[in-house]
């Protein structure tokens, strides 16, 4: 029966080949082949895109991920904290709910060691250790500071008690017995405090006021010659100028013409150097500056009067007639007690072309030769000018012109008289 059915099936198939249904199947198979061809092209295109994406991913893994490792570390740290919190909640809920462990954590730790939990734990421990050390160091510093304040306060208190005892104790005679004073009959504590206050005022006056009432000795008596006028000179920036260089260090430069100035002024003036510098600085300089002894007296800082932060030269203690005293200085604050006795000279800064001392010689010579009774009148006139020496030069120039003009007029008046005499005598 099967053999009889096979030819029948074949015959049916052969019959179907000649029918329109066969053509339909053929068209369907062709369309399916075309669709497969398009799908194969699309698959190749997707394969190429996937290959390029793999290359980009490999490049990103080699370059961008190491730079982004700290950010990934922070994300992992947050996720780990969240996981631990979730685990605690799950433990509270039930023992069967076990938290899931991220399977990629060991892989990330191998790829990026800096993001591993072990490194995070070590860094946290080091940070805590540093904070603890800093806190301990701050505590030690604060203890040292408190100890320093305590020592300083104790020293100040001890110094205060010592000052009260030392400056407040009464004076004693050669036998060691206390000398009675105005505080003897007062309570003991009050005695010491008031004596200390009196001592403070004494040292304050010693600093502010001159060391002695008469700065200069009395004028010389005959047969010795006492110059009529007294010339008071500032040393710094009038006679010498301090100069400092790397090669020589500090040294004092002589003003141009200072030797001639001292020699000429010593003929008519009693020369006194009065400066606010210390004696240990002044005396060696004047010894080298004036080997001939033209400078008769030297007054230093202890002879000044300290007023409003300035060392002022108080001429009242000079023991000389102020009508005959001329002070040459560039600092107005140093002579503000007696401005009418001051002749302001420009401050010398060490330049070699300076010639003001030569003009000053001429000015002083005129005063001495004219026997001016009160030099303050002349000095008061020149005090109104910013540069008295320049004004003196201008006055001398005008005086010379006036003298020449007077001489010319005198000569012009004399010539007609000679002509008239010769006309009368000679008949011409």
UniProtKB/Swiss-Prot annotation:
Component of the TIM23 complex at least composed of Tim23, Tim17 (Tim17a1, Tim17a2 or Tim17b1) and a Tim50. Residues 124-138 have a biased composition (Basic and acidic residues). It comes from the Eukaryota. The chain crosses the membrane at residues 59-79. Residues 80-428 are mitochondrial intermembrane. Keywords: Membrane, Mitochondrion, Mitochondrion inner membrane, Protein transport, Transit peptide, Translocation, Transmembrane, Transmembrane helix, Transport. It is found in: Mitochondrion inner membrane. Essential component of the TIM23 complex, a complex that mediates the translocation of transit peptide-containing proteins across the mitochondrial inner membrane. Belongs to the TIM50 family. InterPro entries: FCP1_dom, HAD-like_sf, HAD_sf, TIM50. GO terms for molecular function: cysteine-type endopeptidase activator activity; protein serine/threonine phosphatase activity; protein tyrosine phosphatase activity. Residues 224-367 form the FCP1 homology domain. GO terms for biological process: mitochondrial membrane organization; mitochondrion organization; protein dephosphorylation; protein import into mitochondrial matrix; protein localization to endoplasmic reticulum; protein localization to Golgi apparatus. It is a single-pass membrane protein. Disulfide bonds: none annotated. Residues 112-138 are annotated as: Disordered. The keyword Transport applies. This is Mitochondrial import inner membrane translocase subunit TIM50-C. One of its GO terms (cellular component) is Golgi apparatus. The keyword Ligase does not apply.
């Amino acid at each position: 029966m099967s053999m009889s059915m096979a030819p029948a099936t074949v015959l049916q198939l052969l019959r179907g080949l000649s029918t329109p249904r066969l053509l339909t199947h053929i068209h369907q198979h062709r369309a399916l082949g075309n669709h497969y061809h398009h799908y194969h092209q699309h698959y190749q295109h997707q394969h190429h895109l996937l290959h390029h994406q793999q290359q980009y991913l490999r490049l990103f893994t080699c370059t961008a991920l190491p730079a982004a490792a700290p950010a990934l570390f922070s994300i992992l740290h947050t996720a780990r904290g969240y996981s631990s919190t979730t685990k605690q909640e799950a433990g509270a809920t039930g023992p069967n709910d076990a938290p899931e462990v991220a399977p990629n954590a060991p892989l990330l730790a191998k790829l990026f060691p800096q993001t591993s939990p072990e490194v995070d734990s070590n860094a946290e421990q080091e940070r805590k250790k540093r904070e603890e050390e800093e806190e301990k160091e701050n505590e030690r510093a604060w203890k040292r500071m408190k100890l320093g304040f305590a020592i300083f306060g104790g020293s100040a208190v001890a110094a205060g008690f010592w000052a009260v005892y030392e400056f407040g104790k009464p004076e004693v005679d050669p036998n060691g017995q206390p000398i009675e004073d105005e505080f003897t009959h007062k309570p003991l504590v009050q005695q010491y405090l008031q004596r200390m206050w009196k001592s403070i005022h004494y040292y304050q006056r010693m600093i502010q006021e001159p060391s002695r009432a008469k700065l200069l000795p009395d004028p010389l008596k005959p047969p010795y010659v006492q110059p009529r006028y007294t010339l008071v000179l500032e040393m710094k920036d009038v006679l010498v100028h301090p100069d400092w260089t790397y090669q020589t260090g500090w040294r004092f430069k002589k003003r141009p013409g200072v030797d001639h100035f001292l020699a000429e002024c010593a003929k008519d003036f009693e020369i006194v150097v009065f400066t606010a510098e210390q004696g240990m600085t002044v005396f060696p300089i004047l010894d080298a500056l004036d080997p001939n002894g033209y400078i008769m007296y030297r007054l230093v800082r202890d002879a000044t009067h300290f007023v409003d932060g300035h060392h002022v030269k108080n001429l009242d203690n000079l023991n000389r007639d102020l009508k005959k005293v001329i002070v040459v200085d560039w600092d107005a604050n140093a002579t503000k007690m007696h401005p009418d006795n001051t002749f302001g000279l420009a401050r010398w800064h060490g330049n070699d072309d300076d010639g003001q001392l030569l003009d000053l010689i001429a000015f002083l010579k005129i005063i001495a030769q004219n026997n001016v009774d009160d030099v303050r009148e002349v000095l008061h006139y020149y005090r109104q000018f910013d540069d008295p020496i320049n004004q003196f030069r201008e006055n001398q120039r005008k005086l010379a012109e006036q003298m020449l003009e007077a001489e010319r007029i005198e000569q012009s008046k004399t010539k007609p008289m000679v002509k008239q005499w010769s006309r009368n005598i000679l008949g011409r």
